[in-house]
A protein has these predicted regions:
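Conserved ABC transporter NBD signature motif
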Residues: 70-81, 164-167, 245-261
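Q-loop/switch helix immediately C-terminal to the Walker
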Residues: 292-304
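Conserved ABC ATPase "signature" region
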Residues: 313-331, 382
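Hydrophobic anchor residue at the start of the ABC signature
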Residues: 350, 362, 378
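A short, proline-enriched helix->beta-strand linker immediately N-terminal to the Walker B motif
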Residues: 355-359, 375, 388
Length: 392
């Protein structure tokens, strides 16, 4: 099975209010050292008593809560398509990242020796400092090795330069492809307008030709960027071949990871992945805007994530199709959340999440606020949709 998410040593601590300014900061450890892999098409269930951190983990995975430590790698997209800023930053400052790793290891060893020397006299805070130092060293290793690989220990400056050149071309190709897709979407919308309003057909045709000319220009640039990426990969492969028999190089090369580290993404970058990673909240009513109709609630995500332009004639039939999949009738399109029962509201939440065609959905106890009589219906709905859509 193909891996979709890989969580390693994930921690989420919530700070507790200090009793005084000089008091040591204490934390509630909601999630502690969680490591697991989630595979495509899999259904993973988390079982635990109330308050044990199930909902927190789901929200941390989606970066709705910022994780304290650990890594969350997402494999639904490649680094080339997401083009995260942290990759370029790591490569531009490769020697600094390697230096930070060595400093973190030295500090962790120093704290471990200090704690061992104290023996039974070691306090909770001594042990906590030791564990945090070890965690910092692991994080520093992850930050450097997942991007640099073997070049972390051999010829760092040259290797980072070659990797930087390769990623720059790949990121440019991804950016150009995104622009091409946007122009195609504009053309699709204009074709719909021309079809529905014949009077505007001539004006739309002129705009379509303009967009098509831009697409042709961008496609030529995209081909050049792809060719440059392939050439950079050949140079990189030749450089790596020099260290084929070096065990130290191969050890760090094995740590290379082409997944996207969700923890290191900036807000705008994470927003691009929101359509891939969705959540169905526990209480349907509090997660719906009471001032928006069902149609507006479902359309909001489609417009935000550029599936359709606002006002597109083709969006409404798609919304109807999504509603029907989730057991909602077309006449409910203009109704407000307060006009529905609890089970129907949860169907709206499910429709809102699935409309953007996600790859991974967190169901945060999505039936616990519902009557027992309709819980089975709502449980079976995501199960049926999972089989049809290949959800995780």
């Amino acid at each position: 099975m193909e891996k979709l998410l890989s969580i390693t040593n994930l921690k989420k601590y919530f700070p507790v209010a200090k009793s005084s300014f000089f008091a040591k900061q204490m934390y509630v450890r909601a999630n502690e050292d969680i490591t697991l892999d989630i595979y495509k098409g899999e259904t993973l269930g988390l079982v635990g008593e109330s308050g044990c951190g199930k909902s927190t983990l789901g929200r941390v995975l989606l970066q709705l809560y910022e994780q304290t430590a650990g890594s969350t790698m997402y494999y639904g997209r490649t680094l080339d398509t997401v083009a995260p800023e942290y990759v370029l930053d790591t490569l531009k400052n490769a020697e600094k990242y390697v230096s930070n790793y060595h400093k973190a290891v030295a500090h962790a060893e120093e704290m471990a020796k200090k704690c061992d020397a104290l023996g039974d006299k070691a306090t909770f805070f001594d042990i906590q400092d030791k564990n945090l130092a070890a965690c910092d060293a692991k994080t520093a290793l992850d930050y450097a090795a997942k991007i640099l690989g073997g070049f972390m220990v051999k010829d760092t400056a040259k290797g980072a330069g070659l990797l930087l050149n390769r990623y720059r071309h790949a990121f440019r190709a991804a950016a150009l492809q995104s622009q091409i897709d946007e122009h195609h979407m504009e053309i699709e919308m204009l074709e719909g307008v021309a079809e529905d309003e014949p009077k505007k057909a001539a004006s739309c045709e002129k705009k379509i030709k303009s967009h098509q000319a831009k697409i042709n220009e961008l496609e030529n640039l995209h081909k050049a960027a792809v060719a440059a990426t392939e050439e950079a990969e050949k140079v990189l492969a030749a450089e790596r071949a020099k260290y084929a028999g070096d065990p130290e190089f191969q050890k760090y090369e094995a740590m290379l990871d082409d997944g996207v580290d969700l923890k290191r993404l900036k807000y705008k970058e994470m927003r691009l992945l929101r359509k891939d990673l969705q959540i169905i909240f526990q209480d349907p009513y509090s997660s719906l805007n009471p001032r928006m109709t069902v149609g507006q609630i479902i359309e909001e995500g489609l417009i935000t994530h550029k599936f359709f332009k606002r006002g597109s004639k083709r969006m409404k039939p798609y919304v109807f199709e999504t509603m029907n999949k989730c057991g909602l009738q077309n006449y409910m399109y203009n109704r407000y959340p307060h006009q529905f029962s609890g089970g129907q509201r949860q169907r709206i939440c499910i429709a809102r999440s699935l409309a953007v065609k996600p790859k991974f959905v967190v169901c945060d106890e999505c039936v616990s606020a519902l009557d027992v009589s309709i819980q089975s219906q709502i449980i079976n709905l995501p199960k049926e949709l999972k089989e049809k859509e290949g959800l995780t």
